[in-house]
Amino acid sequence: MATQLEQLKKEFLEYIEIEKGRALKTVENYDRYISRYFEFSKVKNPSDITAESVRTFRLWLNRQSLGNNKATGKTMSRKTQNYYMIALRVFLKYLTRRKVTSMAADEIDLAKVPERHLDLISPSDLARLLKASPGDDIKSLRDRAILELLFSTGLRVSELCSLTKDVDFTSGEFSIRGKGGKIRVVFISEEARDTLKKYLKLRKDMSEALFVQIGSQKKNDMDMKPLTRRSVERIVKQCAIKAGISKKVTPHVIRHCFATDLLSNGADIRSVQMMLGHANIATTQIYTHVTDAHLREVHKKFHRKKE
């Protein structure tokens, strides 16, 4: 029989999925984070959640070794530890909303994390990457369309995988449902639009997904499977290797390139925030460190050169 706390957790997860419109992946993560705290602290009732039990749990998380080789000494990052605390805070806020007596959410502080480091590739590497799948067969066109679409829209890989064939690309813009169910408009380049048109012209299957698995499919298979996040990540990685790029390249690296390209060329940060789908402008401001460095170089090169 489920404890009172387990029942409240179940209702909380249903609440954030239905009322708050959180993605299923987010709901699953919250379930895992909160359950891990319950198991470690052996709490049964809301009143059992205390500052001391949370502190002990945080200490335990901080000492957890990662991977199979504990000898490496690599432990859980503060950022990952914060995910557990954020989930617990949101759950406690829900309990307060339900007038259930428990620990106050604001008693949980988040750990300070090191300043985020952006993984970027140079403009010349990016140009080679976009040309890494030059053929006119369906697989080459699909891979090229993925690269062009990622760079011209700044889509997250999960957003890219959710696209269907009925998206109207002819206008050069379309709406996408992003994190938290929020809808935003993204814009596509002529290169992306042209490549997508050629790719879709060769599609003979009945799948609704925009991007599908091709290599392992039979020629007469009319129901091709949609690409997964892992599949897209693998395609981007393979194209980067073909382009001779030594750095690790992921769909998110291309998203970073999209943002820095806009800011470096004069776009205002609010517009970039909207195009990326960031809820908080502070998330977008990490890109200004890169563009500030670019502007410093411009200033150094051109300022007061007549003297």
List the predicted regions and their residue ranges:
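Conserved catalytic core of the tyrosine transesterase superfamily
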Residues: 1-307
